[in-house]
């Protein structure tokens, strides 16, 4: 039986990890797939994990610890896994981690620029794409980001907390733009996908895994975001169903937007 692996090592946010695992368990049930948390040692050293894995998810948190743990053999195995037919979903920090390079404006005001191994998106990820008060230790930067999707009409809101846009995504013919930020200048790419040999990669700046009904945080900005997402999520929910079907069955189908 195939499995879904969720990375849960240093740098992963416990809060977003819980949302990711809960969402995946909900949507994976019809596919009869087990959702398993794994650490970096597993991805680096476990023999043949690729053969039993349908989807690898790198959730939200902080990219630098991901790189410190997985750089080298870990990212080489992930890249090979995808090229041989596996699927990769990177959310927020997991999306930064999946890009060739990125720029991130730290809460201190300094600009962090880095290159990464995987390069699933061959360009640069830039963030946080909203100039909110992002913090590694609080929810001060949380907001509801309005998205428009390539294949689903209407506007939906998704949770945002420090995520990226994918710079000049339309200039890369191998990249499909799945969703755009609807209230930012130029409507930059918020979610992108790519066919890589036999595999499929999806990178999302916003937290599409977030389940508002399971959020109990009481900060005013979080409450406002939660209410917006709960009230305006029909296109997002349709997209997520479509997305999980593609990832768990590795279907070759999509259009450019």
UniProtKB/Swiss-Prot annotation:
Pfam families: BPL_N (PF09825). InterPro entries: Biotin-prot_ligase_N, Class_I_gatase-like, UCP016642. Belongs to the chlamydial CPn_0128/CT_035/TC_0305 family. This is Uncharacterized protein CT_035.
């Amino acid at each position: 039986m195939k499995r879904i692996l969720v990375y849960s090592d240093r740098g992963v946010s416990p809060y977003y990890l819980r949302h990711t695992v809960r969402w995946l368990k909900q949507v994976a049930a019809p596919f009869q797939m087990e959702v398993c948390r794994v650490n970096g040692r597993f991805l680096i050293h476990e023999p043949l994990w690729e053969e039993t894995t349908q989807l690898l998810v790198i959730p939200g948190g902080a990219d630098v610890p991901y790189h410190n743990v997985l750089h080298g053999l870990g990212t080489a195995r992930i890249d090979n896994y995808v090229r041989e037919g596996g699927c990769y979903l990177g959310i927020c920090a997991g999306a930064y981690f999946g890009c060739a390079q990125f720029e991130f404006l730290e809460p201190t005001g300094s600009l962090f620029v880095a290159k990464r191994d995987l390069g699933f998106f061959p360009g640069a990820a830039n963030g946080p794409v909203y100039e909110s008060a992002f913090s590694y230790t609080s929810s001060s930067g949380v907001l509801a980001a309005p998205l428009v999707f390539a294949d689903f009409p209407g506007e939906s809101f998704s949770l945002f907390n420090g995520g990226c846009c994918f710079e000049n995504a339309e200039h890369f013919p191998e990249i499909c733009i799945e969703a755009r930020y609807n209230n930012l200048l130029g409507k930059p790419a918020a979610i992108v996908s790519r066919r890589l040999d036999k595999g499929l990669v999806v990178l999302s700046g916003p937290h599409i895994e977030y389940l508002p009904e399971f959020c109990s945080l009481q900060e005013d900005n979080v409450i406002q975001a939660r209410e917006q997402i709960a009230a305006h999520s029909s296109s997002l929910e349709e997209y997520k169903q479509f997305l999980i079907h593609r990832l768990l069955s590795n279907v070759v189908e999509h259009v450019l937007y």
